[in-house]
Amino acid sequence: MKSPFGGIAETLKPKMEDFKVFLLNQAETFENGVRAAARAAISPNGKYIRPMLVFASAPADADEKSLVRRATIAELVHLSTLIHDDVIDRADMRRNSETAYKKYGAKTAILLGDAIFSHMMSLAFEENSMAVLKKTADCVRTVCEGEIKQTLADRAEIVSREKYYEVAYGKTAALFELACNLGATAGTPPDGWREAAENAGKQLGIAYQIYDDICDWFMTERDAGKTLGTDLISGKQTFPLIALLEKLPAEQSASLAKNLPNEQPEKIAKLMRSFGIPEICAAEFSRRVAAAEESLGKFPAVNTGLLEFCSAMRNLKFG
């Protein structure tokens, strides 16, 4: 399936090629007994969305070597969280390959995620910037807290949209925001650009989480390249389900929320379609992308990459 991000990836091709070489070389820094697992985890099969955001946010005077390192920092944060997510979700497939959890078991996968995270912090230290270290550490904490909040949430209680956005920020948008920050601060941006880029990253991150939620309900595992259906099994109330619960009568809504893990996904997906849930999700997705574009519209001369990224987001297919 053709990537909707192919256009911006082509625009950023020289930088992305340097990044990929640098990223894959990071696996070679691990000890012999860990290197094979690190190579599999730091694979060349990702979409590299977060590194693209780093490059797309950078002012013209950004140092290229620093940018590549910052893009790698963003991707390694993402990879370490994916490894841990797969353990939590007991997922067997990621990026059309077996997950570390499937290959090595939960204990080794958790330690591998920790090792990659630790290596990422070592790279962040090389930036010789307390701001980079603090922003990165704060982001990781926010991501972990977002996952914890969703895991500990009362499954029988109907989650509000506001609560969902809070969790979505922690799970996904905080890392998009970090990537935009790392790019924007790699040079000397005009006043307000960092804040505008960060806000765009936040809005795009929430939009992407909504897209990811939709994939779990309406996309095939072959097209998604990963294990699907884990949200239902774990009883997580993602955006499509929350939108459905809003539409159902109170009694039916409460019953569905309470019995979610025992429900048939096909039955719920059919119900979602009957209530126009995919269209509701698409509308909220578009609203978030528009908010990102509005934030960036005040800085047309800094870097058009983020606006191009917004256009690519609009090409994502909702199942």
Give the positions of each predicted feature:
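All-alpha prenyltransferase/terpene-synthase fold signal
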Residues: M1-G319
